[in-house]
C-alpha cells in the first residue's frame, strides 16, 4: 500500500485539513468500487472480506451476520451495513475513509493486534482518500458503530466524522515509541486519532506506544482516560476542544497538550483550545504551556 503522497496529521494536527495526496491504494480501490457500486444483500451467515494492499477486498452492501476482515479491505462502493459484529483479524486493515463508501456496524467493532483502520473523513480535519483536492477538500463520509469500538494492540486507528454508540477502548499497540522507519500504511509515523466524532460512552487509551495521538472536537458522553501512553512526537498528545460529559483523566503519559502551535515547524508559541469536562485529574488539570519553558495554567486544560 503506497501512501507516500500523504501527510501525517501528527506533528501538525491542523495539517490534516490539507491531508493526503492521491495514492496508488486509493486509485486501486476506487477502480474496484466503480465496478461493484450496486447495493448487495449478502447471503446469511458470517462473511469474510479479504484482499491484499495491491488488490483490496471491497466491503459493500448489507451483511446479515458478522463480518471478518482478513488482509486489506476498503469501503469504497456505497454503504456497507453489517447487522452483526465487524472484526479485523491480527495484521489486517480497513480503509473506510472514502467519500464513495461508508460503514455501519450494528454490533461491535474489534481491531486486532497489529491491525490498522481508517474510519470516516471530513474536510475540516481529514480529507477523504478519494477527494480530488486535498489542499481544499470538500467531500466527507460518516460511519457508525452502534456498539463498542475495541482495539487490542492495534498498529493505528484513525477515526473522523463517526458515531460510536458505546465505548472506545484502545489497549496497547502503536508500533513503538518512535516516528522512524514507519510502515507503508503510516508513511510519516504511526498514529492513532479520534476527531470530530460522537462517542456515547467513554474513550480509554491505555498503554499506547506510538509516534502521535490526538483527540479533537469529540463529544464524549462519559469519561476520557489517557493512561500510560508514550508518544515520540513532541507535539503529542493533543487533547483539544472536546466536550466530555464527566471526567478527563491523564496519568503517566508523555507530554499532553490542550493547545495547538501557531507556526508551521515549531511547537511554540501555542493557542489554547480547552476542553469541557466536569472534573480533571492528573496531567489534564491545568492548561499546557503556551510558550517554551512557560508554566502550566492558569486556565483549565
For every predicted segment, state its role.
Residues 1-16:
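N-terminal secretory signal peptides that target proteins for export/translocation
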Residues 34-36:
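N-terminal signal peptide c-region/cleavage motif recognized by signal peptidases
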Residues 40-93, 295, 299-301:
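N-terminal segments that cap or nucleate solenoid repeat domains
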Residues 46-51, 71, 119, 126, ...:
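Extracellular secreted precursors and ectodomains with disulfide-bonded cysteine-rich loops/domains
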Amino acid at each position: 500500500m503506497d501512501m507516500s503522497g500523504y501527510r501525517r496529521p501528527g506533528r501538525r494536527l491542523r495539517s490534516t485539513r490539507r491531508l493526503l495526496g492521491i495514492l496508488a491504494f486509493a486509485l486501486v480501490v476506487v477502480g474496484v468500487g466503480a465496478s461493484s457500486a450496486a447495493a448487495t444483500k449478502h447471503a446469511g451467515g458470517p462473511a469474510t472480506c479479504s484482499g491484499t494492499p495491491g488488490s483490496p477486498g471491497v466491503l459493500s452492501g448489507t451483511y446479515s451476520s458478522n463480518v471478518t476482515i482478513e488482509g486489506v479491505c476498503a469501503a469504497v462502493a456505497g454503504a456497507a451495513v453489517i447487522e452483526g459484529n465487524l472484526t479485523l483479524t491480527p495484521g489486517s486493515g480497513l480503509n473506510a475513509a472514502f467519500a464513495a463508501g461508508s460503514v455501519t456496524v450494528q454490533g461491535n467493532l474489534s481491531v486486532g493486534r497489529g491491525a490498522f483502520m481508517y474510519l470516516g473523513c471530513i474536510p475540516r480535519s481529514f480529507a477523504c482518500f478519494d477527494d480530488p483536492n486535498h489542499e481544499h477538500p470538500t467531500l466527507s463520509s460518516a460511519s457508525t458503530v452502534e456498539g463498542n469500538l475495541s482495539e487490542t494492540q492495534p498498529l493505528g486507528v484513525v477515526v473522523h466524522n463517526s458515531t460510536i454508540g458505546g465505548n472506545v477502548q484502545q489497549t496497547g499497540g502503536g508500533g513503538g515509541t518512535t516516528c522512524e522507519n514507519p510502515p507503508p500504511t503510516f508513511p510519516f509515523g504511526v498514529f492513532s486519532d479520534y476527531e470530530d466524532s460522537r462517542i456515547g460512552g467513554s474513550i480509554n487509551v491505555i498503554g499506547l506506544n506510538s509516534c502521535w495521538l490526538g483527540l479533537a472536537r469529540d463529544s464524549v458522553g462519559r469519561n476520557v482516560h489517557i493512561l500510560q501512553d508514550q508518544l515520540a512526537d513532541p507535539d503529542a498528545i493533543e487533547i483539544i476542544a472536546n466536550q466530555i460529559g464527566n471526567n478527563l483523566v491523564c496519568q503517566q503519559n508523555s507530554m499532553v497538550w490542550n493547545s495547538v502551535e501557531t507556526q508551521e515547524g515549531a511547537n511554540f508559541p501555542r493557542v489554547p483550545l480547552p476542553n469541557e469536562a466536569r472534573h480533571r485529574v492528573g496531567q489534564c488539570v491545568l492548561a499546557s504551556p503556551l510558550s517554551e519553558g512557560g508554566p502550566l495554567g492558569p486556565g483549565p486544560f
